[in-house]
């Protein structure tokens, strides 16, 4: 099974604001379904049931306090001149807390053979670009200071991802609440 550790966005107002942004941005890219918007703390890839149980045990040992994040601004990976992903960002304090939580996840899973292959950059993927769409920086300029709302981070999830022609389908394998 293909799995990852995530934080979901659950606040209706934020999801509605993201949906409005996706509709108003008018770019030729595939929007992320709002029921699938999340922060990927760590992608773990294909694993078996035995390793999944070990991962669950490790994640259950993580202790963290809930915290608030404010979602604002937009950007692209690798950049807005030739993006593959369009994302929504997080204000500095919340980003630092997300980075700290991602580090806790990584430290718990490193003994199971999982290590971040690249530095965690807190973002919400809101569009995936399949074909070259060129420079969208002028379109995104209108949204660079948009505030999408604030969310309380109170749980992390181990999620299963099943790929299909219609896109990925996610299901929860484990939920770890803030303590």
Question: Which role fits each region the language model picked out?
Answer:
Residues 1-179:
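Histidine-dependent nucleotide/RNA phosphoesterase domain, centered on the 2H-phosphoesterase fold
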